[in-house]
Curated annotation (Swiss-Prot):
Homodimer. GO terms for molecular function: 2 iron, 2 sulfur cluster binding; dihydroxy-acid dehydratase activity; magnesium ion binding. Pfam families: ILV_EDD_C, ILVD_EDD_N. Its cofactor is [2Fe-2S] cluster; Mg(2+). It comes from Glaesserella parasuis serovar 5 (strain SH0165) (Haemophilus parasuis). GO terms for biological process: isoleucine biosynthetic process; L-valine biosynthetic process. The modification N6-carboxylysine is found at K124. Mg(2+) binds at D81, D123, K124, E491. It catalyses: (2R)-2,3-dihydroxy-3-methylbutanoate = 3-methyl-2-oxobutanoate + H2O; (2R,3R)-2,3-dihydroxy-3-methylpentanoate = (S)-3-methyl-2-oxopentanoate + H2O. It is an enzyme of class 4 (lyase). This is Dihydroxy-acid dehydratase. Keywords: 2Fe-2S, Amino-acid biosynthesis, Branched-chain amino acid biosynthesis, Iron, Iron-sulfur, Lyase, Magnesium, Metal-binding.
Length: 611
């Protein structure tokens, strides 16, 4: 029978000093011997996805105490990728993931906590906490802050839906007036919560459901809706149950590594492909799998991308649907249900509710259950009122969206495409692979051949696009922006948004060893591995080179003779791999990250061989 980890600091005379300090935090005599559960919050006023989380930790803590545990809250950092976008701040975003994972490990191990409830939401916070949970392997439940409501405004006598990406695109569009741009900006992000489309934050929160580590509705129930409160309360109650099963009954099945198995990672990736999620999720799943000691690689992603259809299209892949519409259609349990009926799911994986995934789908998939409480939950909708407060409204749709032919979520028979929403490409320029969100690519350019125009940084690319250097037919190559080369692997949302602003969204491709925001769409290919700073062929591309992209056949090639490439390699080796014409101040902290970082095909995690 496993002993409570916290007993290390709460039992025996030699721990009198530690107990004295525990008492100073408010613990009473009868608390010693109860499981100490870390409430890992990420409240910050910098991030709309986290601005409403201040009281959530204590909400969970109170429920833990009622259920028989001792709750102790601490906070992690949280970077807002949208605010950090387009300037040097973005260099810090991906490295913050690893800092979050480490900080959770430090706090939990230093204080010998027995379990965790992770209150996350935005882009790097959920992945960082996920890495920590799988590294520590103690009972853990995730509950996120929830999605933002979609923005709405009236233009040309029509009410249109908006999100952050619309503000970026229209802000740089020279054909849009200042008045309209300002109107869109003021309407795009109306409430607290993670940005309203299937961007990275919401994608990752959805994937925690598929992994079995969060409760049904975690990925889709709006931050503003009163129904979301119950997820926090249930997480507080259930984590104590998991502690009892593990520490009192020696039930190893409740541990994160027992839940997030190889089969569960396959399920998460299948969900990601089916819902056209962010390409960043690939990076984070690869990193999390390594923490879980699960053999999940780019080869698995390639395998799954060839068999899983695209069952849902949500912003930025369409403006018709946002996360509030996914919830109305039954949320993640509904998409998993469609995958299960198509024979594309490992339905015997386990969840933190103690159910198999098949049992959980049967209970929560609106296409299977007649439970009015479940249907009521998935009718929770937006109120359209600007607010930074959680649980501030209880608006409901009249009906759920159960149209699997033309609705937000489709069955396999009526899929948006039988090819999934994400694909891995490979070829001489990406020997270890690269990733494209196919759900966001126009069918007319699934095969593309164009001339390279090369930029050594995101900043140069932005200047080139807005300055008119990029023309229709170009393959925009942005290199030395990988985990090492950045360092930090910046997101390229501004270059892709500005291509649209300049009317080139369907006329160009973009290839980078950096990454993309979940808000990116178009023929945007990222995570090119190996990256330029690791000697990848992308570092040898010159202006005017031909690059061929063939998404249906999963190929990408630099069409340059081998002899010419060998000569370029020799010239590059002679001078060393260094991006030309780039002035970028890089802090010591970022240099440390870059020194240890692996390429994107390994999840940009630290290279353990260097330690």
């Amino acid at each position: 029978m496993p002993k409570l980890r916290s007993a290390t600091s709460t039992q025996g005379r030699n721990m009198a000093g530690a107990r004295a300090l525990w008492r100073a935090t408010g613990m009473k005599e009868n608390d010693f011997g109860k499981p100490i559960i870390a409430v890992v919050n990420s409240f910050t006023q910098f991030v709309p996805g986290h601005v409403h989380l201040k009281d959530m930790g204590q909400l969970v803590a109170e429920q833990i105490e009622k259920a028989g545990g001792v709750a102790k809250e601490f906070n992690t950092i949280a970077v807002d990728d949208g605010i950090a976008m387009g300037h040097g701040g973005m260099l810090y975003s991906l490295p913050s993931r690893d800092l979050i994972a480490d900080s959770v490990e430090y706090m939990v191990n230093a204080h010998c906590a027995d379990a965790m409830v992770c209150i996350s939401n935005c882009d790097k916070i959920t992945p960082g906490m996920l890495m920590a949970a799988l590294r520590l392997n103690i009972p853990t439940i995730f509950v996120s802050g929830g999605p933002m409501e979609a923005g709405k405004t009236k233009l040309s006598d029509q009410i249109i839906k908006l999100d952050l990406v619309d503000a970026m695109i229209q802000g740089a569009n020279p054909n849009v007036s200042d008045e309209v741009s300002d109107q869109i900006e003021r309407s795009a992000c109306p409430t607290c919560g993670s940005c309203s489309g299937m961007f990275t934050a919401n994608s990752m929160n959805c994937l925690t459901e598929a992994l079995g580590l969060s409760l049904p509705g975690n990925g889709s129930c709006l931050a503003t809706h009163a129904d979301r409160k119950q997820l926090f309360l249930d997480a507080g109650t259930q984590i104590v149950e998991l502690c009892k099963k593990y520490y009192e009954q020696d039930d190893l099945s409740v541990l994160p590594r027992s839940i997030a198995t190889k089969a569960a990672f396959d399920n998460a990736m299948s969900l990601d492909i089916a819902m056209g999620g962010s390409t960043n999720t690939v990076l984070h799943l690869l990193a999390a799998a390594q923490e879980a000691e699960v053999d999940f690689t780019m080869a698995d992603i390639d395998r799954l991308s060839r068999q899983v259809p695209c069952l849902s299209k949500v912003a930025p892949n369409t403006q018709k649907y946002h996360m509030e519409d996914v919830h109305r259609a039954g949320g993640i349990m509904a998409i998993l249900g469609e995958l299960d009926r198509a024979g594309l799911l490992n339905n015997q994986t386990r969840t933190v509710l103690g159910l198999s995934l098949a049992e959980q789908i049967a209970k929560y998939d609106i296409m299977l259950t007649k439970d009015e409480a479940v249907h009521k939950f998935f009718r929770a909708g937006p109120a359209g009122i600007r607010t930074t407060k959680a649980f501030s409204q209880d608006t409901r749709w009249d009906t759920v969206d159960d149209d699997r032919q033309n609705g937000c979520i489709r069955s396999k028979e009526f899929a948006y495409s039988q090819d999934g929403g994400l694909a891995m490409l490979s070829g001489n320029i990406a020997l270890d692979g690269c990733i494209v969100k196919t759900a966001g690519v126009d069918e007319a350019i699934l095969k593309f051949k164009g001339e390279a125009i090369v930029f050594e940084s995101q900043e140069d690319a932005v200047a080139g696009i807005l300055g008119g250097k990029v023309r229709a037919g170009h393959v925009v190559v942005i290199r030395y922006e990988g985990p090492k080369g950045g360092p930090g692997m910046q997101e390229m949302l501004y270059p892709t948004s500005y291509l649209k602003s300049m009317g080139l969204g369907k006329a160009c491709a973009l290839l980078t060893d950096g990454r993309f925001s979940g808000g990116t769409s178009g023929l945007s290919i990222g995570h090119c591995s190996p990256e330029a700073a690791a000697g990848g062929l992308i570092g040898l591309v010159k202006d005017g080179d031909t690059i061929e992209i063939d998404i249906p056949n999963r190929k990408i090639e630099l069409v340059v003779p081998e002899a010419e490439l060998a000569q370029r390699r020799a010239e590059q080796d002679a001078k060393g791999w260094k991006p030309a014409n780039r002035e970028r101040e890089v802090s010591f902290a970022l240099k440390v990250y870059g020194h240890f970082a692996t390429s994107a095909d390994k999840g940009a995690v630290r290279d353990k061989s260097k330690i």
